[in-house]
Amino acid sequence: MLKIYGSDLCPDCIRCKADLDAARVSYEYLSITEDLRSMKEFLKIREESAAFYAAKENGSIGIPCLISPEGEVSLSWEQYL
């Protein structure tokens, strides 16, 4: 199942969830601002994945972060619509 690390404080995360819901895409949403375990998991992924290079360079957090069932990391949800 698709996993999404995000926060309901983030407009992009809210839009991501709305778009995926409208497209009836199943996913597990992990809030990094409501659950420290999810925050720790996200930070580990962020440190290890090249997908975050541009986000780090721009000073962005890098959410929503999507993890495919195959383990691929992406910061773009449009590919799942």
Predicted segments, located by residue:
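Amphipathic alpha-helical interface surfaces
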Residues: 16, 38-41, 76
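Short, glycine/charged-enriched secondary-structure capping and boundary segments
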Residues: 19-20, 44, 80-81
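Residues that form or immediately flank small-molecule/cofactor binding pockets and catalytic motifs
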Residues: 9, 32-34, 71
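Structural micro-motif
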Residues: 51-67
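Non-catalytic, surface beta->alpha helical segment in thiol-disulfide oxidoreductase systems
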Residues: 65-81
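Generic structural signal for secondary-structure transition and capping sites
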Residues: 47-51, 71
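Local sequence-structure signature of Cys/Sec-based thiol-disulfide redox active-site neighborhoods
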Residues: 1-30
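Thiol-based oxidoreductase modules, predominantly thioredoxin-like and allied folds used
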Residues: 26-48
